[in-house]
Amino acid sequence: MPLQLLKYNPGIVKDVTEYATGKNGPFWVDSDLVRFKNGYPEKLGGWQKDTIFALNPSGNITSTETTIEGIARRMVYWRSNSDGEDRLVVGTHNHLLIIENGSLHDITPLRKTSTGLSNPIATTDGSTTVVITDNTHGAENGDWVVISGASATGGVSADDLNSYYGYQITRINVNSYSIVVPSAATSTVASGGGTVTVKYLIGVGAELGSQSSDPALGFGVGGWGEEAWGTPRSDALAGVNLDNSSWSIDLWGEDVLATVRNGAIYYWDTSAGVTNRAVLVSSLSSANSVPNVARTTVVSFPDRHFIAGGCQAYVVGGGVGNVDNMLVRWSTQEDFSVWNPTSTNTAGDQRLQVGTKIIAMVSAREETIISTDEAIYGMTF
């Protein structure tokens, strides 16, 4: 009996019976993890886990696998012009991280650094909770700190105390907080650690650290009878956060511009290396009238203006004013740090009319798409 060619039509038919498909077929009636190319089924491309390794307190790569800290909100991959290295920047709800050469580097900006703390570490025998004393530290619950220079205390090793990635804190009072280390102390020490430096990462005060938005805004929030009847509570008092923590991340050449939603704008210089953290754009020597607060940012293409949405207004004569959730501002062309409009540059601003706040901005082929909560705008230069 001669062979007969059976040519199946592409696609999966599920809305009629298998018998009925043969009337105009044959058709495929079931599949799993396939796609059709040139009329023929082929298996879907897969994925491979990317192994990343942790760093020790000295910043050297180890053989210990690790994962990113926090819920990833934004990732941007690029290959640097200067050294040809592949890099991935990841903004999570509480960190800004770089994956380079298979290792995980923390470039989260710093809020402040306390140096020369004398024996600020206290341990309790059998407990993994360690108390740090730093007067007027300014940290809030959920913030992160990185300790360096600490010596072994109460049986807790120096490597544990001086962890490269640091620790999330529990605030005790204005002068102290606690961290949880991997191994329990073997003795109680009221004051130890030697001369210690503590770096405080930006956190709650900089709009970073909220894993989810808080929908609990209606009747029944909090305990029954809390405060006086009809008295409105502030967001801070109520613990209410309308937006979760997120990032806008764009490349400026091979460098990184990153903005915390409802927070500040930061810059990371690739050529400076992963031992350096991102810094405020407003702290650069060339900075002029940079917004300190923005909902979102984007670099326009192909003209290269740096655009901020839902940001602080420009104050004539220099500086910034109040936040306007519908205001769009942009830097002068080819300089992300200069935002004061003059007759010789292209910086400027425009307030949008439809909506109450800017939600997102995306750089498209010939324009920048700006979305408010009620409208979509297209912006060109």
Tell where the protein language model's regions lie, with residue ranges.
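Residue-level signal for tight coil/turn positions that link beta-strands
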Residues: 93-94, 101, 125-127, 172-176, ...
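Surface-exposed, low-hydrophobicity beta-strand/loop segments enriched in small/polar/acidic residues
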Residues: 32, 95, 241-245, 258-260
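Active-site-adjacent structural elements in enzyme catalytic domains
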Residues: 251-252, 261, 272-273, 285-305
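Short hydrophobic/aromatic-rich beta-strand motifs
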Residues: 71-79, 85-92, 142-148, 162-170, ...
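Small/polar beta-strand repeat architecture
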Residues: 1, 107-245, 272-280, 284-289
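N-terminal beta-propeller domains
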Residues: 1-113, 204-236, 267, 290-378
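Hydrophobic or amphipathic alpha-helical targeting/insertion segments
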Residues: 106, 174, 253-277
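Short, intrinsically disordered, charge-balanced linker/junction segments flanking boundaries
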Residues: 105, 111, 193, 248, ...
